[in-house]
């Protein structure tokens, strides 16, 4: 140890240096400032500068329109809410605004008008319902009509109903003028059962009138019920109609009698309905049954 020990080296100086370095370390007098290289690189990167610039561009500035510009735009919107490119360019030259701004203004204005129409239309639909008056469609419901007009209307309706119920009011043949004489003759000669039975036909007609049947149909009803009366009627009318024989008026066979009755009905009724045809068939069947009996 003594060989390597330097006598000129002072131990006190070494201790003093150690104490100074400790004090400097404690009080941070000569301490180096360390910086983070990554953070310094991130702050100085150009990408962050670009993103900040883009965020600044995204924030648009709102265009403030003057009163003159708004009046011109509103006037153009009243003319047409969908202006073409030529009209937008003219408005841009007139209002000193870019054409893109004018296009955006028209889009916003159309949206506002559609929203206002949706809010106004329910109110406008409900309001005229209070003032509307419903006209009287049916004449009977109109209370302001006079009683004379009501009477004439009822008379017209009754006439229409009568025309509908009577399909052939104009084709009715007149009553035979010889019928009263025949009835009187039948009343005088009431000894035979056929004449007495035939004279009862007018009373039956009075008791059971047929408004839709003519006199010929009524005569045919009586003849069907009383065939003897038909023979007496034909014998009395032979003097008036000498050209017609009794055999032609009253055939011997029942089938020919049916044909004669049908011919007589068809001559008076050229147009017959299904109901009349069925009545004729039924009456012809009754006549044949009476003849067979």
Swiss-Prot record:
GO terms for cellular component: nucleus. Restricted to the mesendoderm precursors during gastrulation. It comes from the Eukaryota. SUPFAM superfamilies: Homeodomain-like (SSF46689). Induction: Regulated by the Nodal pathway. Residues 117-144 are annotated as: Disordered. It holds the Pfam family Homeodomain. One of its GO terms (molecular function) is DNA-binding transcription factor activity, RNA polymerase II-specific. Keywords: Developmental protein, Differentiation, DNA-binding, Homeobox, Nucleus, Transcription, Transcription regulation. One of its GO terms (biological process) is regulation of transcription by RNA polymerase II. Residues 58-117 bind DNA. It is found in: Nucleus. Probable transcription factor involved in the control of specification of mesoderm and endoderm. Acts in parallel with bonnie and clyde, faust and casanova in the Nodal signaling pathway. Belongs to the paired homeobox family. This is Homeobox protein SEBOX. It comes from Danio rerio (Zebrafish). The gene is sebox.
């Amino acid at each position: 140890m003594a060989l390597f020990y330097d006598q000129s080296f002072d131990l006190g100086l070494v201790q003093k240096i150690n104490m100074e370095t400790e004090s400097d370390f404690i009080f941070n007098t000569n301490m180096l400032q360390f910086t983070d290289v990554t953070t310094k690189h991130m702050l100085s990167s150009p990408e962050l500068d670009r993103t900040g610039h883009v965020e600044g561009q995204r924030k648009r500035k709102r265009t403030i329109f003057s009163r003159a510009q708004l009046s011109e735009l509103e006037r153009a919107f009243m003319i047409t809410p969908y202006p073409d490119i030529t009209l937008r360019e003219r408005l841009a030259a007139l209002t000193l605004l870019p054409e893109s701004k004018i296009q955006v203004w028209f889009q916003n204005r159309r949206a506002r008008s559609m929203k206002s129409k949706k809010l106004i239309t329910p109110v406008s639909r409900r309001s005229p319902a209070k003032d509307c008056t419903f006209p009287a469609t049916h004449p009977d419901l109109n209370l302001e009509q006079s009683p004379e007009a009501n009477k004439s209307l009822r008379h017209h309706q009754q006439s229409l109903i009568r025309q509908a119920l009577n399909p052939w009011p104009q084709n009715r043949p007149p009553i035979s003028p010889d019928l009263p004489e025949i009835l009187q003759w039948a009343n005088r000669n009431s000894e035979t059962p056929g004449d007495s039975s035939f004279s009862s036909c007018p009373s039956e007609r009075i008791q059971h009138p047929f408004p839709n049947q003519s006199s010929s149909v009524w005569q045919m009803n009586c003849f069907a019920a009383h065939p003897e009366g038909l023979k007496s009627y034909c014998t009395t009318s032979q003097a008036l109609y000498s050209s017609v024989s009794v055999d032609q008026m009253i055939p011997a066979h029942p089938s020919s009698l049916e044909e004669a009755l049908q011919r007589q009905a068809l001559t008076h009724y050229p147009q017959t309905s299904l109901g009349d045809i069925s009545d004729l068939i039924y009456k012809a069947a009754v006549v044949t049954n009476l003849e067979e009996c």
